[in-house]
């Protein structure tokens, strides 16, 4: 069997332990599960149906709600040798519809598939797409005698990044890079065959698809799934599912752990058993040291061990994994001088900014480079993170110039083939620290400020804004000025001016920032990606064009002159 082919591994598992549970999905109707034998047969049957309609290598758009049907159809695509293109189902969210239309326009799929009850809705959402697409429901056909024989360098699927909808970028994941990254993930977490996973993450995002579905199947393990909507409504259900199925591995962004701390009641906590959870993986967004402490303290009574918490770093462009905390060791938290950090240096300090280390890179080569010159920087210096090695994707679908710029990094000494991540970070005693995104960096009066630091400081600034998101960026007027867009609960906001002054006071006291421009908006006004990350550049553009619906704005005369002339409010 081809060792660089995921389906060959799945076929072997189906032959060796056909009756072992592979995947389970829980919703309000209960639990449905598939064994390896059932899952493999479903993939071959859907693969047979696909093979009658499209040629190997064709793209197929997959827009499914959470559930087992997506799993079967995605694996059916691999079995038929067609290129799956996972995307969110375009429900009531205009963001999801824009996202799907952008993905469809870029990928030019031959088919668009969804669940039978949703065919009409998806067809309507795709109206006007280029090329014109009508949705279908995949069916079970005559099973393929065996999965399609693939070349290691051929495409397995397109993973679209969570950027702006006008810049949909499909990361080309080959069969080689998929299998390579699954090996890297298993090594990072020190996982054995049969490992048990649990997840609520969406399947159209890399962490949900690769880490929480394909990795357990690659290992002959089991994964228990639920929908993101159910998690957001009832965070306790995720932890309950982990305990009920004895999951060892589950991953989520930082906000999910804070949500559990805030929303899980004492009675729910009493009923939880988290003693099996050995890998509490935190990643996909900036990791807060305080979140790690709060989560470990809150759920210790449920059997959670503090050394089970891990911090990880990865991205779609590496198929997922880059680095992670060593198993059995809590993440390294290092306190650095914030003023030195503004000068791109990590200087240890007794008090200051707490940085969470994302482990030591193992299978991949990681260096810190000057983003302008490509010169490798020494330990403790902040620069752009460059990566080279197994799992790095083949580039962006039909974007040769972006592929060259991003995947063709060459150092000042002539070493080539590096992925330029666009992330800022540093290595210290071998540990990788992430400090922010280059494009999000706020530069004011020569100071480099990281927006997520400022946003985090505003979490508890006022009852009307408690645990509500904020978005910090700078605008040129012509000198850079800071803008804070803060979501608020209007019913708890008696005095907008008072909140503005509290925001300015916090930023002045903690960061030495002068009078910031403040825009107070309703919940949901700050734009996010489909994975929940704040879209700072899009929110900035909306602010600049007057496209945000504001409760109240407190802006400097220069910002008003540049960005509010001709706009209401």
Label each PLM-derived region with a short phrase.
Residues 1-34, 38-53, 74, 555-569:
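N-lobe entry segment of adenylate-forming
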Residues 18-21, 142-160, 166-167, 177, ...:
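Conserved pre-ATP/AMP-binding loop-to-beta segment of ANL
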Residues 23-71, 92-96, 100-101, 149, ...:
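Conserved AMP-binding/adenylate-forming core of the ANL superfamily
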Residues 179-196, 203-248, 263-268:
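Conserved AMP-binding/adenylation subdomain of ANL enzymes
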Residues 243, 250, 389, 394-395, ...:
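AMP-binding/adenylate-forming catalytic core of the ANL superfamily
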Residues 356-360, 364-365, 372-380, 384-444, ...:
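Conserved ATP-binding/catalytic segment of the ANL
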């Amino acid at each position: 069997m081809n060792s660089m082919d995921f389906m060959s591994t799945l076929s072997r598992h189906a032959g060796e332990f056909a009756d072992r549970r592979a995947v389970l999905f829980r919703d309000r109707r209960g639990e449905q599960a598939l064994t390896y034998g059932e899952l493999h047969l479903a993939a071959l049957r859907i693969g047979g149906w696909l093979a009658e309609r499209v040629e190997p290598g064709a793209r197929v758009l997959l827009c499914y709600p959470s559930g087992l049907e997506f799993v079967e159809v995605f694996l059916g695509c691999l079995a038929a040798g067609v290129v799956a293109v996972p995307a969110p189902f375009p429900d009531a969210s205009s963001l999801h519809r824009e996202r799907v239309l952008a993905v469809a326009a870029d990928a030019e799929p031959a088919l668009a598939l969804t669940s039978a009850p949703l065919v009409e809705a998806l067809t309507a959402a795709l109206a006007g797409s280029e090329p014109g697409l009508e949705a279908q429901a995949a069916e079970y056909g005559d099973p393929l005698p065996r999965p399609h024989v693939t070349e290691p360098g051929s495409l397995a699927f397109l993973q679209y990044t969570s950027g702006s909808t006008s810049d949909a970028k499909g990361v080309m994941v080959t069969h080689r890079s998929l299998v390579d990254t699954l090996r890297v993930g298993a090594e990072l977490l020190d996982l054995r065959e049969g490992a048990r996973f649990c997840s609520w993450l969406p399947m159209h995002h890399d962490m949900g698809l690769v880490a929480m579905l394909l990795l357990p199947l690659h290992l002959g393990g089991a994964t228990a799934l639920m929908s993101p909507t159910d998690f957001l409504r009832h965070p306790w259900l995720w932890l309950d599912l982990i305990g009920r199925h004895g999951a060892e591995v589950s991953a989520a962004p930082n906000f999910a752990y804070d949500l559990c701390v805030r929303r899980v009641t004492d009675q729910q906590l009493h009923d939880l058993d988290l003693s099996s959870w050995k890998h509490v993986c935190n990643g996909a967004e900036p990791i807060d040291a305080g979140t790690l402490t709060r989560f470990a303290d809150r759920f210790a009574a449920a059997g959670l061990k503090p050394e089970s918490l891990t911090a990880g770093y990865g991205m779609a462009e590496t198929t997922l994994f880059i680095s992670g905390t060593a198993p059995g060791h809590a993440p390294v938290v290092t306190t650095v001088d914030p003023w030195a950090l503004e000068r791109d240096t990590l200087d240890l300090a007794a008090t200051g900014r707490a940085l969470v280390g994302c482990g030591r890179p193992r299978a991949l080569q990681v260096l810190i480079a000057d983003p302008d010159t490509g010169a490798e920087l020494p330990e403790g210096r902040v620069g752009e993170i460059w990566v080279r090695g197994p799992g790095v994707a083949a580039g962006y679908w039909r974007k040769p110039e972006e592929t060259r710029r991003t995947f063709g990094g060459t150092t000042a000494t002539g070493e080539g083939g590096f992925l330029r991540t666009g992330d800022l970070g540093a290595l210290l005693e071998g540990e990788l620290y992430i400090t922010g995104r280059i494009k999000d960096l706020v530069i004011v009066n020569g100071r480099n400020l990281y927006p997520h630091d400022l946003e985090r400081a505003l979490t508890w600034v006022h009852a009307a804004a408690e645990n509500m998101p904020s978005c910090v960026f700078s605008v040129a007027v012509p000198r850079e000025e800071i803008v804070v867009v803060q979501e608020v609960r209007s019913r708890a906001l008696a005095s907008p001016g008072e909140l503005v002054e509290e925001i300015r006071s916090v930023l002045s006291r903690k960061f030495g920032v002068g009078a910031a421009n403040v825009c107070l908006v309703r919940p949901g006004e700050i734009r996010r990606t489909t994975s929940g990350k704040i879209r700072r550049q899009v929110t900035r553009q909306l602010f600049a064009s007057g496209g945000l619906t504001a409760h109240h704005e407190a802006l400097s005369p220069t910002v008003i002159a540049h960005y509010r002339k001709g706009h209401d409010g």
